[in-house]
Amino acid sequence: MKRDVDARGRACPIPIVELMRAIRESSVGDEVEILADDRAFPSDVRAWCKKTGHQLLSLTEEGATLSAVVRKENVP
């Protein structure tokens, strides 16, 4: 299953908080796509995935919008 989260217009740390909530509510293997426009988001999402063990599948930028797709992994 894929979930979509729109965190555009929200400053750090809210996009990561919204991602955490979506991952928590997802099943292992599900993907969450999050849209953000906070310029700190790319480094934040990379660090969060590294820290938590969830997999960052893609990180793209189109205009002012950043898009990350994260897969929930089977981690404690």
What is each residue range found by the language model?
Residues R46-P76:
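C-terminal structural segments of small proteins and small subunits
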Residues M1-R8, E33:
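Short amphipathic
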